[in-house]
């Protein structure tokens, strides 16, 4: 018996891009100490008060079936947060709670694409994007951003791919590049969506991690409220990655359909986790800033290290917990550089090629270890790159 085409073709017959990460984990399992700069996992755990509230809610009995769209108070809090940050009036009817941002991405594409529909996404991309699109039986089509444009997508390139497409997925602040899309970029994207009648799915899980520029939700742009679904999550903003709690914000009629989808798939999110998420949101912006601050510090540390040499270049990262580094001067691909760095110095980074063709010749560094260790790893990475150019 064979598995379904839907499941067996999720990876598209190719790599999932995680070979270097898997090699690093094999080394760790064998007893080798490895500095991991690979995945976007905070080096702190979920704050004790949030866990205490989660425990209180669970012991208090919120362990049965919870409201499938999400508990009203949490949906209201997210709606108020979105209204305050974007100026777009938002109510609980525009919000559905999901088991994390990944589930929100899957649900959003299920809502707006039918089997065989073309779904666009920007390259470089978060590694799950094309598989998510295949998982809903859409046809994934990448639109390349360019290093020469600091990975700001060109509206003209999106328009060239948009004929007959149904949706476009964007992510700002961006994983893997750390790029924050400018207003000009987003206005161009919005114009393409209006011109070609595209649904826009905006992954905004890094919206609290802004180092330069501003976060603009495209749902707030003219004519976009009724054609945009926004994906949000507590994972990055509140260091709640394992709690698996996210949301979709969009038109009320689409949210009602997503509630039907959840009824037949996830059947909602545990009530005690939703209670803890509500508690976390009520801690306010000061808490979100506290969670984001280590990445701001480490970005500054990395930029200082990079300024002291001229082999490794930095993509302008205005947000998120990552840096994309240009290592083309070494003559190696991102993958070859990552493997070499791992074997020579036991430092694990992600090859740019893991995130699409546009990031070839780059590596992604996650700023997710303690400051002094991160600074030391960056110095070693740059010294390794310089050694390669000396050998050449």
Language-model features: where?
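A short acidic, glycine-rich active-site loop
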Residues: 61-65
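PLP-dependent class I/II
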Residues: 2-6, 10, 20, 27-57, ...
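Extracytoplasmic catalytic/substrate-binding loops of multi-pass membrane glycan-assembly enzymes
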Residues: 13-15
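Short beta-strand to alpha-helix junction loop
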Residues: 69-70
